[in-house]
Amino acid sequence: MSTLGHQYDNSLVSNAFGFLRLPMNFQPYDSDADWVITGVPFDMATSGRAGGRHGPAAIRQVSTNLAWEHHRFPWNFDMRERLNVVDCGDLVYAFGDAREMSEKLQAHAEKLLSAGKRMLSFGGDHFVTLPLLRAHAKHFGKMALVHFDAHTDTYANGCEFDHGTMFYTAPKEGLIDPHHSVQIGIRTEFDKDNGFTVLDACQVNDRGVDDILAQVKQIVGDMPVYLTFDIDCLDPAFAPGTGTPVIGGLTSDRAIKLVRGLKDLNIVGMDVVEVAPAYDQSEITALAAATLALEMLYIQAAKKGE
């Protein structure tokens, strides 16, 4: 099963260059990478505004503004000296075939994880997290979920491919333990009986960052963690370019501080999703996503340097 392309493959959406100007590596399974970046240009499960398939391209493009900083503030070290990161480009699948995308993404992830790599993925709409969770659970067992979002995505509507149902499905499949999982920034209707700890946007905006992080760490414990960041967790003032924006969200400053504070968790996989550049202004949504992705890599590099 072919899941990745090459430089001549015209089915690819965003493979001009890699994240942070990293060279493309279309054979990441045999590389010496610690973390592999994969773009998933998919938005067929979107319920609002489409366009998330162009998210990986937008994140990579704007990341050129971040590539110049060797000793990134406030970390004061070069992530690339501690962590070997490669960008393998985008998942290749038949556009219009959601099932093929899901199967190929899971197969790609399983192959990477079996080769000892870890994954940072760029959506695409949030549905892409479900096949990633399936692959990670095969490798790491049941996981805790740390989920930044405006929506809980725990809705049971009977639709197989929907970006609002993944975290209803994942506990039922035994992929994640909701009692050790936390959802941050929520500000839409949700089922309060699904087992997740919900730190809604009002709490997150009013409480101190250290207080929130202490609660997250207590809930998660020492379980393997999958970290997923839906960019609509941010207020539309900071991230207008997304499919289902909701006012009253987090500032980019608060989000970055919270992500940095997750360094001590046992994070085994990560993604940033729901960037839809057609609705962006001055690339600020893509820049927020790229910056958060870079911070995710820095927390891994910081841990490796200890």
UniProtKB/Swiss-Prot annotation:
InterPro entries named among the record's database cross-references: Agmatinase, Agmatinase-rel, Ureohydrolase, Ureohydrolase_dom_sf, Ureohydrolase_Mn_BS
- What enzyme category does the UniProt record give? hydrolase
What pathway or pathways are given for this protein in its record? Amine and polyamine biosynthesis; putrescine biosynthesis via agmatine pathway; putrescine from agmatine: step 1/1
Manganese among keywords: yes
Sites binding Mn(2+) sit at 126, 149, 151, 153, 230, 232
Where in the sequence is the signal peptide annotated? none
Does this entry carry the keyword Manganese? Answer: yes
Q: Which reaction does it catalyse?
A: agmatine + H2O = urea + putrescine
Q: What does this protein's UniProt record list under function?
A: Catalyzes the formation of putrescine from agmatine.
For this chain, the family text in UniProt reads: Belongs to the arginase family. Agmatinase subfamily.
Q: What is this protein called?
A: Agmatinase
Q: Name the source organism.
A: Salmonella typhimurium (strain LT2 / SGSC1412 / ATCC 700720)
